Amino acid sequence: MLNAAAADRNKDPILSVLKSRVASNRRLFALEISSGTGQHVVHFAKAFPNITWQPSEVETQSLSSIEAYRQYHRLQNVQPPIYLDVSQSWQTWGGFPAESCDLIININMMHISPLACTTGLFHGVGQILKPQGLLLTYGPYAFNGSIVPQSNFDFDQSLRYRNPEWGLRDASFLTTLGQENGLRLEEIVDMPANNKCLLFRKDSVV
């Protein structure tokens, strides 16, 4: 099993956001896109036994780690991880029908992937999220062209140096991208270490 220190640090703050906004008294289906090591999905699944959780990844090593966490924790409400390339058409995302997911989570992906992954994420989520369903994204973001504090600005510069296609995405751009795909930015939640949770609600009509 892989272990990411950042996942250990942020899993409880993100869980707190979920607990105050996601129902715990009815059956739901949640897709985590870019599940990483698998630490998040098992943590959330323990807190929400009413939700069937579907982890996904594009990296083979991560898929193996997710399955190892799933087996270790013996959680009946976590499905085996699936391969999902978010830059590809949503029809390739494991065969999910349109409007089949109550909740979709995407943690720390957008700033370390090409822009095509971000646009693909919003396009696909707009298709497979149920009306009034919730998309939660987490990470560092720019706001109206500005990146603060300095540590986030430096982080963005280091990412772009490593890969020109990486970098912090602007929340205003994501708001527009969401609107184009029937997703309304409902809330921005301040998180530790200068991160944010962006909560998008799918409107009834796309």
UniProtKB/Swiss-Prot annotation:
Belongs to the UPF0585 family. It holds the Pfam family DUF938. This is Methyltransferase-like 26. SUPFAM superfamilies: S-adenosyl-L-methionine-dependent methyltransferases. It comes from the Eukaryota.
